[in-house]
């Protein structure tokens, strides 16, 4: 069967996705060589808005894109995927233009792969930072066999989060992220395998979640007062799983990246953080260590 012409693809309707599209979304991820991640798709479709184009051959979805709105302050864009058999036929550009028109009024942010960056630049996005994805088996000792370097956390302790911590988490997150993520954070207890908070003399100074993605466990979001608190949260989360870890670390946090390398997490890939409608991301970058997932920020 021959592929539809670019002209016929341009006429395919763009529709809203819902939780009934979980399997087709996961199939599309698999088609592009990504983990299926139905668990993550479920969260993204409930907390955000999915856009899709049905494949003209009747086999699932030809393309997807997802937005997560944080009020008028920011909208995250992600999961721009096109089935391999429809690649390089203008679908991604058309879908992104529709999303940008629909989300008009709020600044946009996304994490771009090297493959996707030229499209985003053509559409007016500008690079504002980078993120380093690292992954691997967590080891409690360094490569020499001696205990890995650990920053002093003095009076900081971490523990599993409770429902009573949500408001303090939201306040800390608003400072770090610069936009209200309440609707996302409220879903973390059900979504995560583990949600951990850090305290210093009764004050909440950080939080992080651990959630499953295929054979790996992902750390994110990670918001912390400083690198020492971030490391304490990751260390205690790592102790709760036997899976390899994965985390997308904002590139400016070189000290944390060095500590993670010492614990066995190696570079996997890099993405470019890009924005549209704003010259920089809101919030306090010094406290923002890792996104929940690049698609949601």
Q: Where on the chain are the PLM-derived regions?
A:
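Glycine/alanine-rich phosphate-binding loops at beta-alpha junctions
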Residues: 2, 6-55, 60-69
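A structural microfeature
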Residues: 62-63, 129, 206, 269
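Intrinsically disordered, low-complexity, positively biased terminal segments
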Residues: 1-8, 18-19, 23, 56, ...
